[in-house]
Amino acid sequence: LEILEIPETQAERWLEAQFPGTDPKELHRAALYGGGNLGRSRSFLEEEAVRRRYGQALSLLSALANGKEFDVVSALAPFEGDKAGFLQLLQDFDGLLGRLAALPYGGTADPELAPIASKISPLRAAAMHDRIDGIRQRLFYNAGCPLTVALFGAQLKEI
């Protein structure tokens, strides 16, 4: 499931067959989250921790879109001592940035990103994406997770 990627519409149909009775909006969210990767989409539906982390990434993006510094700090605070969780947040946040940047160019409509899309341009989303790789490298080579989380928040506010 993790290797095969398919169009999101096909992913939704596959998820509907695997999870009968699931709300179609949740199936759509899972397909968008997975980006055509069935394993990621399935984990979104099966694991509360995955949905919670995705919600935290969405909260971070919303806080940045609205220019609320306290909300940015609040969204990052749970990860100050959680290196693995922060790396997962970065992955989800990066996925949101990619979808956000693609929206004006024919990306899949996403009701959760629609209000944010008018506030964060594709260039700004790309600039945020560029910061993520550097933060991942810092986490890999340095153990200072709280300082790295703070640095990431500061860098995002400058963009």
Predicted regions and their residues:
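Charged, glycine-rich active-site and insertion segments that engage polyanionic ligands
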Residues: 1-92, 99, 103-159
